[in-house]
C-alpha cells in the first residue's frame, strides 16, 4: 500500500505520535483521490518516533484490509493479536476507533515492550 497522509497526534509519554493512512492503488497516479471511495484497500496505523531519530517509527496498532477483509493488528499486545472485523467494517469506523483509543493502545505497548512502564 501507499501512504496517503499522516496526521500528527498530541505528544504522549514524551514521544511524537502519528496516525498514517495507507491506500491502494497509489494515490499519486490519479488527479484526485477520495477516501474511501477511490481505495481498493486501506489501512490506518498509529505509530511513534523512538527516542533515537535515526531509528524507524514503531507501530502500536494497525487496522487494514491487506488480507482480504478488515482486521485489527493489535501490535501493542504480547503476543501480537489479529482480530478479524468483518466485511462491513468501514474505514470511518477504523479511523474513529484509533483516534479515540490511541493513548490506551500506546500505554499498553509501553507496558508490554519497554522499561518505562508506570
Listing of model-derived features with the role each one plays in the protein:
Residues 64-118:
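Mixed-charge, Lys/Arg-enriched low-complexity segments
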Amino acid at each position: 500500500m501507499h501512504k496517503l497522509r499522516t496526521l500528527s497526534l498530541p505528544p504522549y509519554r514524551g514521544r511524537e505520535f502519528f496516525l498514517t493512512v495507507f491506500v491502494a492503488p497509489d494515490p499519486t497516479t490519479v488527479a484526485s483521490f477520495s477516501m474511501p471511495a477511490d481505495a481498493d484497500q486501506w489501512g490506518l496505523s498509529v505509530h511513534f518516533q523512538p527516542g533515537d531519530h535515526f531509528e524507524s517509527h514503531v507501530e502500536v496498532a494497525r487496522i487494514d484490509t491487506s488480507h482480504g477483509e478488515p482486521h485489527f493488528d493489535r501490535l501493542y499486545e504480547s503476543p501480537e493479536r489479529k482480530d478479524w472485523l468483518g466485511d462491513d467494517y468501514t474505514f470511518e469506523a477504523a479511523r474513529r476507533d484509533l483516534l479515540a483509543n490511541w493513548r490506551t493502545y500506546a500505554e499498553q505497548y509501553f507496558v508490554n515492550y519497554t522499561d518505562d512502564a508506570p
